Design a protein with these regions (language model features):
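Basic polycationic patches enriched in arginine
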Residues: 17, 24-25
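Short linear motifs centered on Gly/Pro in flexible linkers and helix caps
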Residues: 25-26, 223
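Cationic, low-complexity basic patches in intrinsically disordered or flexible, solvent-exposed regions
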Residues: 10, 19-20, 35
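Mature catalytic core of soluble alpha/beta enzymes
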Residues: 37, 43-240
Length: 240
């Protein structure tokens, strides 16, 4: 610290240098205080990091992105979300021979009324509502014809017209008699095959996101086959 006499001797440039040093000391002190606060905040609240996971489910890759500060908690939640999708696949897949959906399709035309799970009942109820709204453009009873076109794509040859005509006779959403209150269903037309490809994936995405939210992971995004559902935006962003 300079004396008044020293200041008078060195003149105003000396005084300016001393003032600049004081300003720098104050700035460094403030910066240090802010850094200490930031370190304390991070230590006590954690820092949300981006985590990405992927698992093959429903014949495609299901991808989950979450922002979380707890890695162990995140892994538990993501596993639960993937497990939920796996359960839904066992219910609604038309590829799995022992799925609940295929077991119902196997009863088509038998006159038997099947008791179905609440899960399948809920999805079929929504599918039937969409069929009515679209005048039959959306129809989950089109499985037999869809299988023909899948095969045509594999072998690169169109199905014969008579085979296609036979499959089309099995299609018609009114041939699915659903009692949504008691969760029973009957397929009245022989040969009808159910295909939930237009609705099952979206339902699975919604359910996976719900599981993540239940575990406290609100900043999450789930995607599969081009479809996406999203929760809260990542930290510091307005959206995904």
């Amino acid at each position: 610290m300079l004396s008044c006499a020293s200041v008078l001797q060195c003149g105003s440039p000396c005084l300016f240098r001393e003032q600049s040093k004081a300003v720098r000391r104050t700035a460094l002190h403030d910066a240090g205080a802010k850094l200490m606060f930031a370190l304390f905040f991070m230590a006590t609240t954690g820092l949300a990091e981006r985590h990405e996971f992927s698992r093959p489910l429903m014949g495609m890759a299901f991808r989950i992105i979450v922002h979380s500060e707890n890695e162990a908690k995140t892994k538990r939640a993501v596993k639960a979300a993937f497990d939920r999708v796996a359960v839904l696949n066992q219910i609604m897949s038309d590829y799995e021979p022992e799925s609940e959906l295929n077991k119902l399709s196997n009863l088509a035309g038998s006159g038997k009324v099947a008791k179905i799970s609440d899960e399948l009942c809920r999805v079929l109820d929504r599918a039937q509502a969409l069929a009515v709204e679209t005048g039959g453009a959306f129809d989950v009873t089109a499985g037999a014809s869809i299988q023909l076109w899948r095969r045509a794509r594999r072998v690169k040859r169109l199905p014969p017209q008579y085979v296609l005509a036979k499959a089309l006779k099995t299609v018609g959403f009114r041939g699915l008699k659903l009692d949504a209150k008691n969760c029973t269903a009957e397929l009245t037309k022989p040969g009808t095959r159910l295909d939930l490809g237009g609705i099952a994936k979206g339902h699975a995405l919604d359910e996976a996101l719900a599981v993540l939210k239940k575990h406290g992971l609100l900043q999450a995004l789930v995607s599969a086959g081009g479809d996406i559902v999203a929760g809260a935006a990542p930290p510091g962003k307005k959206g995904w």
